[in-house]
């Protein structure tokens, strides 16, 4: 069967499914959902209190123009809060969970409600930037400011919303002149399913890299809730692209593989009727996918996550149970293939995410991502004894690799180009290397050439930067990979990060995809992978 015929057959199968409303995995989904529910992790709890009261300082040399100065140990507990008026507290590190506080009347009787405002924030600038009028492209509701009206003092109050923060500002908005009151106690119940680190660093590990590993691990831990969340400040949900990177980092830190299994089954249980996975699944307020959010690159990387899970655990039962889901993702992706073995990104509307970089041409990297997915899926099939079901994959890989080199590799310039404008980007080089389209020698030259060209589109964030370092390691550019990791993630540490950020450009502290930088997550899953590189390659990063 040639590629044109194969694609036509697969497209007809998909069309039949959509036309007649049949659910590809209807008989399997109830069992998958039950496995997902049975593997829901227990959250470990830790009670924390603030370590200092702080004062905001506007400082152009600080990240995003703000920093905090310590005022010492908080001592407001016995004071009349009407005299305190406002206080900002530092809990010492990024934490996720639930906030409780207690108030008491100091004299007379409460004759009117008390109104308090609580502002929780991850970074100093977020805490000190006016939120209104709202400019963000995501919901104003994601910001962690809460107004509480107390009609009955002398009791504990727990805010129902889960918070993710380091700093807390408490403001008195309204009270009666007829009585005084104090906030005499408060605490935070931090939660995570991570457990303890299982992979200690070598004693030879340099302090700078040790600190990067610590922050990386803290980032992953905060995102490990009842699913691998992408960032606990905003969505209580699981993204497939983030899950792949989190599973790699988890291997060299907490080794909580049951959580990976839980997440794989959640995706499968909520697959679309056509058998294709949604890009993300909600964990809260109730389980379910974000309908309509289909990202082909994330569908394909789910297969790689399943493969890596099998390698980590030897859980052949799960891999075999979910094999048909992996196979279906490839079937769907193959409907985008042209007869000349090139992935056609214009075959039908589709979201292909590699980076937030504006103007990024994804033709070359999508060709490579498809090759990489075919390789990983065939390896998965071979490991579970299903290679005969996809015996055409090796030939497809060979044909697509040949087509990729012809269409996208400029032999004279020794670089990968993409699209009608022959765009040069770092990601086009890295994905061609990851897919094995370029040899290590060719890959080294391509990366060097791309980095030397001032017109090259660079990665705009940690997700894409992960793949650059991955490509450098594949090509044997060990020293350059180490330098890049220390420069990039170490740059965040030097700017005060205690967890790694969703968006980071060393030359643009205000970078945001949401038109308002306080919406950015300062603890984000796709930024946790230094611990993967540091753990996997100790001879490069720990000596």
What role is predicted for each listed range?
Residues 12, 222-226, 269, 273:
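Short helix-loop boundary/capping segments at the starts of domains
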Residues 15, 121-123, 425:
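Short linear Ser/Thr-Pro motifs
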